[in-house]
């Protein structure tokens, strides 16, 4: 083999190695972002528990309409968005705790599959921001001390799942950073607890990979 041929093979091998290295560092999106402003009917949504519907809510981003959960006697209330399953994903939603004496919370459900899921939630009756997993019952994974979000005001929840790295934000503040790999993919949803009456608006789901 000539010296020129050896150099060509070496250059090609180096290029392939560089491309493989780049591919390992960057995950291609699974598909387009999903955005829900709740101006249309809830086609494709799946109610697991609770009483969910579209209502006029002050401060909603578009047309004054938001998704509201009104059941007050269930332990937990969950609704699943269309699409998925999602593995690595970034999710955000605006929520407004309207009322609740036992609880006044709002949360994002992610990697929901066969009734099991992760949850990040805030509660207007508690000075904490928490990450849980649910498998027949709820288990706390991580908690941050905060000033409880104000009742009757809009707030923003965000969660990012990258493999086993689960992170959470409240009103743009990074508060949770935890590792847990028991659930790898599933659907996205919204959550309330007990007697919480809560409005949700501007749900955004950004897939990071093919899940």
Question: Predicted regions: what is each one?
Answer:
Residues 1-17:
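N-terminal secretory signal peptides and thylakoid transit peptides that target proteins
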Residues 26-49:
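Extracellular carbohydrate-recognition regions
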Residues 56-77:
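Short carbohydrate-recognition loop motifs
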Residues 71-130:
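Secretory/extracellular carbohydrate-interaction modules
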Residues 93, 153-162, 166-168:
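Short tryptophan-centered beta-strand motifs in secreted/extracellular beta-sheet-rich domains
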Residues 136-156:
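Short, aromatic/His-centered strand-loop micro-motif at the edge of beta-sheets
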Residues 171-189:
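Short, solvent-exposed beta-strand-to-loop segments that form ligand-recognition rims
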Residues 185-211:
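Ligand-recognition surfaces built from glycine- and aromatic
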């Amino acid at each position: 083999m000539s010296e020129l041929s050896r150099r060509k093979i070496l250059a090609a091998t180096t290029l392939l190695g560089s491309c493989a290295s780049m591919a390992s560092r960057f995950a291609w999106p699974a598909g387009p972002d999903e955005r829900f402003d709740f101006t249309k009917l809830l086609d494709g949504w799946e109610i697991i528990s609770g009483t969910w519907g579209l209502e006029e809510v002050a401060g909603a981003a578009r047309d004054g309409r938001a998704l509201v959960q009104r059941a007050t006697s269930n332990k937990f209330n969950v609704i699943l968005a269309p699409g998925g399953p999602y593995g690595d994903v970034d999710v955000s939603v605006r929520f407004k705790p309207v009322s609740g004496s036992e609880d006044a919370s709002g949360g994002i459900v992610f990697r929901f599959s066969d009734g099991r899921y992760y949850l990040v939630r805030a509660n207007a009756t508690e000075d904490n921001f928490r990450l849980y997993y649910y498998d027949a019952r709820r288990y706390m994974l991580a908690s941050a001390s905060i000033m409880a979000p104000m009742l009757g005001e809009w707030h923003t929840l965000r969660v990012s799942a990258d493999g086993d790295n689960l992170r959470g934000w409240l009103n743009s503040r990074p508060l949770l950073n935890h590792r847990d790999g028991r659930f790898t993919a599933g659907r996205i949803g919204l959550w309330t607890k007990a007697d919480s009456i809560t409005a949700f608006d501007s749900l955004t789901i950004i897939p990071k990979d093919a899940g």
